[in-house]
Amino acid sequence: MPSLLILIFTIEVAVELINTIGAATINNLLWRIFNALPTKLSAQFAEQRKLQQDYLKVRRELNATSSQDEFAKWAKLRRQHDKLLEQLEKKKAALDSTKGNFDKYITGIRWVGTQGLRYFLPFWYAKVPMFWLPYGWFPYYAEWLVSFPRAPMGSVSIASWQLACTGFVVLIKDAITALVVFVMGMRQSNVKQAVPVKAVSGEKASDEKEGKKEL
């Protein structure tokens, strides 16, 4: 089943990418993309930014106003300051709640699309051979092992294929990581070698020699 082979491999690649990048990082990226779209939520964020700007403006004016010399103006700014602060806190709490629900929704979809399929597919297709081994090339115990748990003898089970894909993806990731570290190390060493060393001038060197002779 070529389509199932590719699906299992794709799922393992996706799981490894998520583990490498981080679920929180992916959620934050999707949240920013969603906020960039022309939705009601993006309008709420625009309102929050405007409230924040108004609040900071009133706060600066309040700090620059004396409560003794200009009490009436100070009291008016103080009321505006408290009102804007209350609105800003309510808006922030509402958006934080929306962000929490968004994270739960995305986490659920991601789990179903990755970990959920990792458990469901091997169970559902446990008896389906992924592909057949060449007849007589492998001993009995090897054929039994790769067909475990319920695939026909002489075939590769979905569990064995999934395990092989996981090992291959991890191996490729480690190789890429090692290559990146090696290249970065080579660049740093080349930069260090390219730094010019200040040469000692002839007069200074001769002065040092004369000083040594006098000693």
Curated annotation (Swiss-Prot):
Query: What quaternary arrangement does the UniProt entry report?
Result: Interacts with GET3.
- Gene name of the encoded protein: GET1
Q: How does it sit in the membrane?
A: Multi-pass membrane protein
Query: Where does it reside?
Result: Endoplasmic reticulum membrane
Similarity comment text for this entry: Belongs to the WRB/GET1 family.
Recorded protein name is: Protein GET1
Q: Name one Pfam family in it.
A: CHD5
**What UniProt keywords apply to this chain's record, in alphabetical order?**
Coiled coil, Endoplasmic reticulum, Membrane, Transmembrane, Transmembrane helix, Transport
Cellular component terms, GO, for this chain's entry?
Answer: endoplasmic reticulum; endoplasmic reticulum membrane; GET complex
Q: In this UniProt entry, which residues form the Lumenal topological domain(s)?
A: 1-4, 132-155
Q: List the disulfide bonds.
A: none
